[in-house]
Amino acid sequence: MGRDSADVMIADGKNTLITVGLNDDVVDAELACYHKWKDQPRNLVAGMHGSIDQKCEAVFAYLTEHVVYKLDDAGNQYIKSPARLLQDGCGDCKSLTMFIACCLHCLGIEHIIRFVNYDGGTQYTHVYPVAIDEMGREIVLDACEKDTDGVILYDYARPSKRQKDFRLL
């Protein structure tokens, strides 16, 4: 992934999709956007080789080097395309998930978009992608989780009270 993202993906200049509604609306919008944008980073990941874990590490490292996590403004739910996320340089869990899931699709890696809740309530409060490796093992790609020193954690998921998985590819 040594390519310049500006050479391979161009944000269309339009406003990011905004959904304001019920929790299911956000889940539906995330999945609809995935199907719309899933091929967008194809040129960005072209030529990547190695095991599924090596490819996942490369995608994860690229994202965390070029984008910072930023919570959406209160009351708004933004879902950014991979190109828009890279252009803006920041996004929340929905946009980070979108970027990684689209890269996994382009690499032919089976994956899950996982919606979770940490407090036991009825609303999903976080989303992250999970890759499935050659042995069927899950590789968690939550680019929002950090250790106590602020280092983003690869292949780590905080225990959740509730989850809903959407298996893709």
Language-model features: where?
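A structural boundary/capping signal
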Residues: M1-L169
